[in-house]
């Protein structure tokens, strides 16, 4: 189960043009977004470690997103 709240995900889907959103659809998207965010975060942590830092910086996140 996703840790991301369902309500903001529901709003994102509605912002994309949906009039109604099922709870299952919002939960599935939340799970996918969480998996993708975790993947990016792990890459960013590796980049920070490689640079000899413990702190993840915005540059690490940007680079992780591009890779």
From Swiss-Prot:
Ranges that cross the membrane: none
GO cellular component: chromosome; cytoplasm
Record keyword DNA-binding present: yes
Pfam families: CBFD_NFYB_HMF
Region (Interaction with DNA): 20-22, 54-57
Gene Ontology MF: a single term: DNA binding
Alphabetic keyword roster: Chromosome, Cytoplasm, DNA-binding
UniProt superkingdom: Archaea
InterPro entries: Archaeal_histone_HMF (IPR050947), CBFA_NFYB_domain (IPR003958), Histone-fold (IPR009072), HmfB-like (IPR050004)
Functional note: Binds and compact DNA (95 to 150 base pairs) to form nucleosome-like structures that contain positive DNA supercoils. Increases the resistance of DNA to thermal denaturation (in vitro).
Native organism: Pyrococcus abyssi (strain GE5 / Orsay)
Oligomeric form and interacting partners: Homodimer or heterodimer with another histone. Dimers then assemble into higher oligomers, with the DNA wrapped around the protein core.
Keyword Lipid biosynthesis among record annotations: no
Family: Belongs to the archaeal histone HMF family.
Cell location: Cytoplasm; Chromosome
Official protein name in the record: Archaeal histone B
């Amino acid at each position: 189960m996703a840790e991301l709240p369902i309500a903001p995900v529901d709003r994102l889907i509605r912002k994309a043009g949906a009039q109604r959103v099922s709870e299952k659809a919002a939960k599935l998207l939340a799970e996918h977004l969480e998996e993708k965010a975790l993947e990016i975060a792990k890459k960013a942590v590796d980049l920070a470690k490689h640079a000899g830092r413990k702190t993840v910086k915005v540059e690490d996140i940007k680079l992780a997103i591009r890779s």
